[in-house]
Amino acid sequence: MPKTDKLKQLIDIVNYYKQLEDNAKTIGNFLETVKKLNQLLETPKSENKLENLLNYLKYIYLTSNFPKKKIWLHLILQNGLTIYLPRGI
């Protein structure tokens, strides 16, 4: 698949997730989006799958447009992945 097609698909997946209503942005939908992104990023010679996945998780978080108080998953990507969930989840 040409790189431009893959990039377009990645952008389409991220844009689809971003346009979901806040109540549809569930952990399940988030993980499904991550799965789709990871499938596109996989290549037979890829040794950096986790790094690629973390970069796209960071992209989704940084480009999300819903208010900080409604973010149920906060990603900090520094030397790995740290996940902060609000109390009660």
UniProtKB/Swiss-Prot annotation:
It comes from the Bacteria. This is Uncharacterized protein RC0041.
